[in-house]
């Protein structure tokens, strides 16, 4: 075995030069050999060289070396995470072994291997952990460790040692829950600690302190806390604590509530009280929670309304009755249990007499009985005594044979063998514990005779009727002692028995035979004895023969009642005796009533009936004499008779007069008062100011007049004060309530009887204390001062409240020292005898208020006024003025909720105001933006006229709708289409210059019109750059403009100057007007001095109309009612809306511009709307394209309508328009005027009714009129105007001035039309400001102006796609402002522009149209006026077809061929018209009140011609259909171009009108088909019609008043074609007024023109 080691030793020797090699060799020994060597104990030789760590040199082993041995094995460790830990390991061996540690078979890396390691290998071999690393995923330190010690001799391995990381989670697996138990019950709380390692132990804490488990009642087992018998002290908050080496974890708090079953602190006790006293059962219970206490009566309910349960649960029963006796139970109950306690109430009822003894009158030797019966609780004892005698007689005494007096068990006193000495009073007295009462009766002894009553008649006579010679018998049966004597009397005369017919039998019966008539009378039976007599009467009637006499009925004894019982006297007074009896029901019939008779010697010697018809068995007999003896008997009666009398009652003596009235014996009174003994009961305290006193009288006396209750406060504080007296003057009363007592005061009370000035003995004294209340006054003299002994203490002193306000005994005083915060509050309480207190530890700088209040048993009283004190830093009081700093005051105010709320409200209001301002500002800016850009967005043709007038020296824009410009006044901004101007209500000054000078100059206030061409131009900004240089026309417009009518237009159609349907000025002269800004001819004649008759009331016949020339004027709104309204003052110059034409025949003015008409009215008008400023733009000169105006106007005086000279511009006589004094008429006013004036020509787009006529200012920027609707009716007004003007020969017409220089083009806000300049416009430059603003738009506008005419109506646009263009784009711009027009706005806003004629072809047609306008030749027609002169009407004068004109007659389509007329069937809501619409510019005005709920599609809406007068026989279906549609627009339609003659205007000549219509059309239609009544017609709401070109009605074809504005937009297509062709004339060629003639000439002329 040794040789086995040789290789090993050789290897060792070879490696001896290298210690590392040697160390490695040591690590690689043969374990088997080593173990074997160790086992055999063979020492391994080692070298002596100490430096050789292996202990050998060369191949030698040292003898002293030995292998390693573990001396100290490591032990298991449980360490908290992050804590240091050490695994100990010690080994010994030689050489010293090296120690390594292994965990789970792997070598542990220490700091020697890695200096950063948290494991350190200590020199002793222990493994030290700087901190235990332990995470959720990585747990490098936890595991099983072994220590290995090695040297070259071998190695030693220690025992396994586990290192575990202690864990203790936070969450308990089960938290204890609240427990509620009752006292004495076990309580269990369960708790499961959080998971941990090692398993945590459980302990408990109560109210934050460790629970003492030494108490044998408390057991902690398995996490459960058990308390076997809980006490009230066990209640609290418990926490379960889980503990291990990591630490502690506390559970949620669980509260143990130990409830207490109810238990009685004070149980109710049995009570015995007297009747009418109060009973109180006290019951006081405790428990947790506080139990509820209630009361119940075991054998019934508590007495209603007589019991109360006080706050202390005391049951009080007031005025106890005998029925209240029983057991009362107090029930205390809470959620834990219930407890009951009972007490018995015994009601002690004082005795009272059931039967009182009465005075008796008895004869000597007789026996008398005094009855006395009493009841009470307990049953009272009754005893008798004779007054003045002390001998008492009791019922239970055995009778004495020698005594004549005895008392029965019931209490009756019987005296036998009455003697005269027995006379006197006998007193019956009853007694029990509740009291005693006495009564007495008098015994009177009389002689025997005097004692006998008078006789009694048992059966007396009855009434009878007998016949002559008949026999009747009167019976009278009487009893008495001795036997009474019976006598009869007839009528008071004794009956004589000497007559043989009369016989009295022995028994007293009287018999009379052969009765005679003289026997009739009253018969009385008198029964008499020495003691008296009795009488009974009956009436006997004897009748002659022949009178039927009914024999008396035989009386059956069984039918008569039996006699009642003997009456008993129950009560006696001075004048009254009460009797009671019982009927005898054993025999006889039942009685129905009773009769009572009485006898007294004091009243007479006979029985007297004192009561009859007594229905009861008790009766009080009144009216008796005092001190008299009476006897009574009772008889029963029914229908068959009267019974025998009852037995006579015992004698009854009424009482004598009062002793006081008779004079009294003072000694007797004093003696009796002295004998009256009062017993005073314990007083009952009712409240804090009243006490009830009860007493009883032992010796009652008749001389007791009342009682005096004496009381006074008692106690040392009060001394011997005087007695206060409370008198009771009712002798029978035995209790009283003393009121007005002092609160909380002890009183001593006694009672004393009295009679007048005599007084009896006092009762014993009783004591009682009233209830306390809280003091009603504060302590007095409260002072606060600094305490000298302590720097931060104060001394509070006071005096008690006044004694009369203490309301009891002051038990303590409460002192409040309150700082400005609750943490500084200090409260003190001292006893009632202390009047000062020191309050320490006041905080310097804090202001304190000190209050003091006294407290009694009832609570604290009133607090004193607060005393303020504040100490500085040195403890000295601060002066009052320095106590509150300004900062503190400000801080207090700022902290107030009201201040904070006010600041919040103010901020909110500011925010809201800012929001409103911002909203309005944004809206205004958006309005400005939409004014410029919005027009282009909406393809609409809107004629937006605006009147600019002066008010107070400054230019003001009219209150109408947008459109008028005053280019010379920057302030008078034109109204934008999307805005509404503010309407002035009063414009009385005539500052509007509507008259142009002959030289072409006009005043700066001249009205400028915005035409739809402007809108068209503006709209094209958004098209595909289709721009054409559009030159602004300079002149060539010939119409007057009455500016004030623009204002009228904003009103309803009622006008004060409309007389009989005619508009006249105060002088009766019609006023001319025009729809567009036309160059007016000189109005040479003064309108105010016109010769027209304002009172003229007629319709001109058609013949006259033929001779009258109708000037060409545009009408916009039927203003016949409107003008009348604002012309109420005759001094105001007459005006007609600038766009209206006066109808001489109808008296109406007609509207052809919806822009104007829709602006009137107040409905829907947004007042105060401002018009944003619109920049002016320089316009191109249209002079190159348009011919000049005619050099010589037509030679007719009516041409003055079209020219006004400069000198007449401000002529006072000139019809200068005046703004209306009242802008709007109310609907009712309109209706009234409508009724007064009769039928009024309907207005296009507005109902003839006032409601429909009234306009509201609504934005019409999205409503588009049809291009031709608006123009024709303007020209159709001419016949009336011409006819009326013929009455003014002095009027002269001046030629129109030559074209002026170029003027700025219309501002971009106008819709569709370029404002044509007036003469004054030619020389008037816009303000620079507006020009500058306009320069920005000039370039754009110039390129679009030429597009205007092409956009108006070209063959491609208006004919080819007329319906769509009208519906899509044109209608969008038309607005109606009546209430009915709200829908039309909505309709137009949704109208499609798909059908718009803004196309490339349209653009070309527009350019071509403009060229055509420049050289258009129109054949003129002459007509005759009234004088036979042929002339042209002004409206038919040749004039250039300027795009600035809204006259659709001047269209480029004149040259086109007229289409053949088509017959169209008129359909409600879908009226179709066919017309040439390719050459007309968009007319200016839509129907003002057209109301369409839906936008018509381009296939629905069809072009309609101008409505012309219809024949009276025309079918009225149009009206009816329109009315059924509910349209607000009333007008007459022209079907297939046929004109209708208004019957009102020309009722006598409808045929001529029909012929004229047929001529104009070229094909005549039957008049019956178009015969419509003159009534106003509402067009259906869907009838939003495109433009139709206005016609030139001749004097032979006057306008129907119903076609006012409807003729502008409603008409047959044939008529429109006729009028369009005729109307397309070159103004330059029109030298004289012309008119249309009937026949085919029209067509011929049209053909010539087209050619």
UniProtKB/Swiss-Prot annotation:
Residues 33-57, 1124-1202, 1224-1337, 1352-1397, 1420-1651 are annotated as: Disordered. Residues 26-897 are extracellular. It is linked to Neurooculorenal syndrome: An autosomal recessive syndrome characterized by variable clinical features including congenital renal anomalies, neurodevelopmental defects, intellectual impairment, cardiac defects, and ocular anomalies. Some affected individuals present in utero with renal agenesis and structural brain abnormalities incompatible with life. It is found in: Cell membrane; Cell projection, Axon; Endoplasmic reticulum-Golgi intermediate compartment membrane. It comes from Homo sapiens. Receptor for SLIT1 and SLIT2 that mediates cellular responses to molecular guidance cues in cellular migration, including axonal navigation at the ventral midline of the neural tube and projection of axons to different regions during neuronal development. Interaction with the intracellular domain of FLRT3 mediates axon attraction towards cells expressing NTN1. In axon growth cones, the silencing of the attractive effect of NTN1 by SLIT2 may require the formation of a ROBO1-DCC complex. The chain crosses the membrane at residues 898-918. Residues 1322-1336, 1642-1651 have a biased composition (Acidic residues). InterPro entries: FN3_dom, FN3_sf, Ig-like_dom, Ig-like_dom_sf, Ig-like_fold, Ig_I-set, Ig_sub, Ig_sub2. Residues 68-164, 170-257, 262-346, 351-446, 455-541 form the Ig-like C2-type domain. Residues 1186-1196, 1296-1307, 1480-1490 have a biased composition (Pro residues). Residues 1459-1470 have a biased composition (Basic residues). Ubiquitinated. May be deubiquitinated by USP33. Residues 1-25 form the signal peptide. Its main location: membrane. Residues 44-56, 1137-1146, 1255-1269, 1438-1451, 1592-1601 have a biased composition (Polar residues). CDD domains: FN3, IgC_1_Robo, IgI_2_Robo, IgI_3_Robo, IgI_4_Robo, IgI_5_Robo. One of its GO terms (molecular function) is identical protein binding. It is a single-pass type I membrane protein; Single-pass membrane protein. The keyword Signal applies. This is Roundabout homolog 1. Widely expressed, with exception of kidney. SUPFAM superfamilies: Fibronectin type III, Immunoglobulin. Keywords: Cell membrane, Cell projection, Chemotaxis, Developmental protein, Differentiation, Disease variant, Disulfide bond, Dwarfism, Glycoprotein, Immunoglobulin domain, Intellectual disability, Membrane, Neurogenesis, Phosphoprotein, Receptor, Repeat, Signal, Transmembrane, Transmembrane helix, Ubl conjugation. Changing residue 564 to S: In CPHD8; uncertain significance. Homodimer. Dimerization is mediated by the extracellular domain and is independent of SLIT liganding. Interacts with SLIT1. Interacts with SLIT2. Interacts with FLRT3. Interacts with MYO9B (via Rho-GAP domain). Residues 1147-1163, 1384-1397, 1602-1614 have a biased composition (Low complexity).
